């Protein structure tokens, strides 16, 4: 076939005596007499077009990313990132969620962040261990009453309740002494496992009750006389 186009004067036998006409009629026009020249021009024309059509660098990156990140169901189009990173960054996460989120180009900032994350986790773990290992001594806690426990309750102070034994001993002491000295108050607090403040408040309330009872029994006495009588007694 190629030899036929190269040599246009190749003799061809036709029926009916038309051989002379075939030799006189040219196969190509005057502009395309040489078939080899025609094909060479076409090749140079195609090469020139290919050289003139230049694609930007982002086009190749998009096509490469589309081939890598393409999914079966069809995914969102890839966006060009001038920094050169094709990964989804989430706040507070040190590892990638899946294989698709792994970066194609890892920057220096990303490497530093991966190094800092284990250090932060180690420091947080050490601080938690330090808090859990701290010792709490008895003198560091509030001491309200011995009946509530050896270290007392650290919550809000409520109404103090006394046992029958404590109330009986306090009534005996009040019968003999309506006012207590500091030394006697310390002795009673150690004996009854109470604080000095609790004993002081109990004696104040008991004196108020005793005054009301005496006032009902002896309404003629004035408060001054009652106080003098209490001091004398």
UniProtKB/Swiss-Prot annotation:
Residue intervals annotated as DNA-binding region are: 155-214
**What UniProt keywords apply to this chain's record, in alphabetical order?**
Developmental protein, DNA-binding, Homeobox, Nucleus, Transcription, Transcription regulation
Q: Which GO terms describe its cellular component?
A: nucleus
The answer to keyword Transcription regulation applying to this record is: yes
Q: Where is this region: Disordered?
A: 213-233
Q: Where is this motif: Antp-type hexapeptide?
A: 136-141
Gene3D superfamilies, per this entry?
A: Homeodomain-like
Q: Which CDD domains match?
A: homeodomain (cd00086)
What biological process terms from GO does the record include? anterior/posterior pattern specification
InterPro entries with a match to the protein in the record:
Antp_homeobox (IPR050296), HD (IPR001356), HD_metazoa (IPR020479), Homeobox_antennapedia (IPR017995), Homeobox_Antennapedia_CS (IPR001827), Homeobox_CS (IPR017970), Homeodomain-like_sf (IPR009057)
Composition bias, Acidic residues? 224-233
Any Pfam family:
Homeodomain
Q: Where in or outside the cell is it found?
A: Nucleus
Q: Name one GO molecular function term.
A: RNA polymerase II cis-regulatory region sequence-specific DNA binding
Family statement drawn from the similarity comment of this UniProt entry: Belongs to the Antp homeobox family.
State what this protein does.
Answer: Sequence-specific transcription factor which is part of a developmental regulatory system that provides cells with specific positional identities on the anterior-posterior axis.
* Full protein name: Homeobox protein Hox-B6b
């Amino acid at each position: 076939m190629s030899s036929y186009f190269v040599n246009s004067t190749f003799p061809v036998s036709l029926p009916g005596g038309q051989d002379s006409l075939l030799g006189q009629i040219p196969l190509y026009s005057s502009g395309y007499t040489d078939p080899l020249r025609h094909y060479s021009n076409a090749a140079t024309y195609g090469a020139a077009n290919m050289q003139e059509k230049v694609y930007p660098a982002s086009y190749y990156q998009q096509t490469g990313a589309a081939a890598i990140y393409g999914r079966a169901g069809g995914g969102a189009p890839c966006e060009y990132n001038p920094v050169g990173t094709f990964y989804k960054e989430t706040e507070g996460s040190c590892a990638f969620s899946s294989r698709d989120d792994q970066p194609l180009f890892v920057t220096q900032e990303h490497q530093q962040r991966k190094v800092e994350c284990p250090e932060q986790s180690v420091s947080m773990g050490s601080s938690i261990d330090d808090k859990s290992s701290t010792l709490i001594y008895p003198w560091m806690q509030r001491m309200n009453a011995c009946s509530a426990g050896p270290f007392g309750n650290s919550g809000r102070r409520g109404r103090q309740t006394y046992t029958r034994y404590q109330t009986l001993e306090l009534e005996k002491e009040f019968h003999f002494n309506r006012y207590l000295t500091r030394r006697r108050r310390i002795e009673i607090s150690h004996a009854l496992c109470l604080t000095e403040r609790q004993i002081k408040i109990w004696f104040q309330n008991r004196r108020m009750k005793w005054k009301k009872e005496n006032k009902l029994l002896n309404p003629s006495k004035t408060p001054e006389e009652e106080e003098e009588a209490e001091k004398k007694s």
